Amino acid sequence: MRRSVIVFWRTLRSSIVCGLAMLAASDAFAAQEQQQQPTPPPSAAVQTPPPLTPAAPPRKPPPFPNRANEIMPSWLRVRGEFRERVEGVDNAGFTAGRDDAYYLSRVRFSATATAKNIAGTIQLQDARVGDKSIGPTASPFTASFDVRQAYADLGHATSRLFARLGRQEIAFGDQRLVGHANWLNSGRTFDAARVTFKTKPAQVDVFAASVVRILPGEFDKSGNGNRFAGAYASSGRVIPQGTIEPYVFWKRDINQRAENGIVDSLDHVTTGARLVGKLPARLDYNIEMALQRGTLGPDEIRAWAGHWQIRETVAGAWTPHLTGEYNLASGDKNPADNVRQTFDQLYPTAHDKYGLADQVGWRNLHHLRAGFDVTPIKATPISFNYHSYWLAERRDALYAASGAALARVPGGAASRRVGQEIDIQASRPLTPQLILAGGYSHLFTGPFLEQATPGKSYSGPFVMVTYVFLAEK
């Protein structure tokens, strides 16, 4: 514990110094430019009367390092982003004394060239991890310098027909099933073709893709037997004061292990819908349900999942919101009956969906959340959340946010009770280009984790600085 605190403090101190240096540099450039402005001539003897309505103050120009696009031709735009995050872990694997603290550094550079009805974008990325002594250090912690995105846009994003071809991010809805996972140091992209159709009543996205694998020492690649395709629609004309988003996703993967131990191909379809909207009494809701059917070799796949959330906006200072939420994902009742009932969460942005600690994913799960958030200072939201977890099936595993099995009791657990978690996090933009965020999570183990693991409680603080350069924000 003492070592993790020391390392966490050192890396945190480095991140804070780095952020303050960026802020100081931006202010210095701005101050220098103000000093270089010519001194206005003395006022004339006859003064012009002030206008009846005061003119709006002039817009403050961005700092010098963020003005690259002002000197670029109008058809070319660039943007850079540097992100530094310090993470700490106490009792990794729910084991006493397995403490760690490490830093995650990521740099991205993007350039977009635009013609009349076509545009091309390339994004380069380099992501590194330092001082990590427990667990893996490869992807998603490390992604050596490579092309992260490279795509062409045909048409305009606001036109009725729009296509994007190439390596790209794909995200739908709350990203519970398909997302870019940008919390991870490497993030996620697909080699894909995506076409968007827009009409007044609805929008439909159709895509065919393959997830990009981060490969150490060589260029990142897709393929390897992975196929992912589907359609996602959205309409605000069906439900009063609401939106419905039906979807269908098809996934194929090779070299997957069936219940009898043989290696075969996975092939399944996920159909579902998301509903979001407003209710009376300052309430809003968010509902999503999905059904999976398919095969993995000799196994039949029958799984489903659901998400139900209601939120109240409370009148008064600090703009408080109260949130209640329930999540369910089916688990496997019998690991030897050739029927797979564990829900596959596909390719989500899973961070903080089921707890800030990311020890729980949308598989074999019952999850309750109660939380509230306030904004006591302008542009500084603070959120507090309580989570409670149970397994859906005792003979199945507890799965992490990544989708990987985290803990299991062979033969079945004595209890489905996983544990409880409390979270707090906040963020604040120091400038339009510099954002500071931090949080802390603590997971109290229940009877299942005490049986399946050493059973010690788990905690994880983080501090993160994000700085945008070249572009305004």
Can you annotate each of these PLM segments?
Residues 51, 90-105, 115-160, 172-183, ...:
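Surface-exposed loop and membrane-interface regions of Gram-negative outer-membrane beta-barrel proteins
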